[in-house]
Amino acid sequence: MTKPILLASLAALAIALPAAASASPANVVVVDNERVYAECNACRSAQASLQAQATTIQSRQAALAAPLKIEAQALQAAADALGGKTPDAALQARATAFQTKQNSANQELQRLQQNLQSSQANVLRQINAKLGPAIKQVMLAKGANLAIDMNNTLAVGSGMDVTADVLVALNAVLPSVSVTPGAATTTTGR
């Protein structure tokens, strides 16, 4: 009588063991995404190029602002000299021309800034398109089934940080990126 109970118990145990073995604990790796974006080869090159574009915009802004400032001061002095009288047609024409120049300068700077922002977004899109697969490649190599950003952790055990491995994998598949505005640099109001 005890033999059938013993056999039934062993059979139940044999069925339960594979189920318990398949529920192995999660193997987690941690990636410092900030470090990846700062240190990958394509990221560094793109950052230098984007910084140069930003500097060019600042220089253009200064070049446009200097003559406008002088002209604004001259217009203000002419208006102050009127002592409250109505400006003549020539002064009104100068003021209108100044406003047109100022609007044109603002539009140019806005277009340059939009191009820079579009270039930044395009760079991020290219990096992100390769970063995910690079992380998955490292996860597979490490036998991990979960990757977490370093900034979303409270504590990390030794051997869990695979940022260096991700950098190697990303640099291999993404040697450079295009630092140009993306396809859609304007909004269409859709």
Q: For the regions a protein language model found, what residue spans apply to each?
A:
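Bacterial N-terminal signal peptides
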Residues: 8-17
